[in-house]
Amino acid sequence: MRIIGLDVGTKTVGVALSDPLGITAQPFETITRKENNKLRRTYARIEQIISEYDVTEIVVGYPKNMDDTIGERAKACEEFAAALERRTGLPVTLWDERLTTVEADEVLEECGMRRENRKTVIDQLAAVFILRGYMESKQK
């Protein structure tokens, strides 16, 4: 009954997983998107994680603009989420991700992590914030 949270960017996808009970969210990995593979390898890796960890639900960060409008990145996330739903047959929820990367960067800075080292984990941490927000809303 795990849930996977995804922070989809143009170059990377941050991945977070819930525990089997769906209570906590942990950083899992960052998938690097290479231009030449388009999204095929990205989808394949996500599908592999879903299979290995018995994921039953997918949450994709939805980067709305601060004025609540839908921009190009949000449209790309809508397409990504729709493709994941088609490919996996699992329910996919778009979750407002405004400022999650900023929040993740601030947390890493407070922990004393150097800026150049943050790149490897910032997307995973943003995915944790997306997933945690979604799970907390379900508990209410």
UniProtKB/Swiss-Prot annotation:
- SMART domains under this entry? YqgFc
Database matches in CDD domains: YqgF (cd16964)
The primary location reported for this protein is cytoplasm
Instruction: Identify the GO cellular component terms for this protein.
Output: cytosol
Q: According to its UniProt record, where is this protein located?
A: Cytoplasm
GO BP term, pick one = rRNA 5'-end processing
The GO terms describing molecular function are: nuclease activity
Q: Which Pfam families match?
A: RuvX
Class of this enzyme: hydrolase
Q: Which UniProt keywords apply?
A: Cytoplasm, Hydrolase, Nuclease, Ribosome biogenesis
InterPro entries linked: RNaseH-like_sf (IPR012337), YqgF (IPR005227), YqgF/RNaseH-like_dom (IPR006641), YqgF/RNaseH-like_dom_sf (IPR037027)
Q: What is its EC number?
A: 3.1.-.-
Q: Record's family? A: Belongs to the YqgF nuclease family.
Q: State what this protein does.
A: Could be a nuclease involved in processing of the 5'-end of pre-16S rRNA.
Looking up HAMAP family in the UniProt record yields:
Nuclease_YqgF
| PANTHER family from the UniProt entry | POLYNUCLEOTIDYL TRANSFERASE, RIBONUCLEASE H-LIKE SUPERFAMILY PROTEIN
> Know the name of this protein?
Putative pre-16S rRNA nuclease
Q: Where does this protein come from, organism-wise? A: Lachnospira eligens (strain ATCC 27750 / DSM 3376 / VPI C15-48 / C15-B4) (Eubacterium eligens)
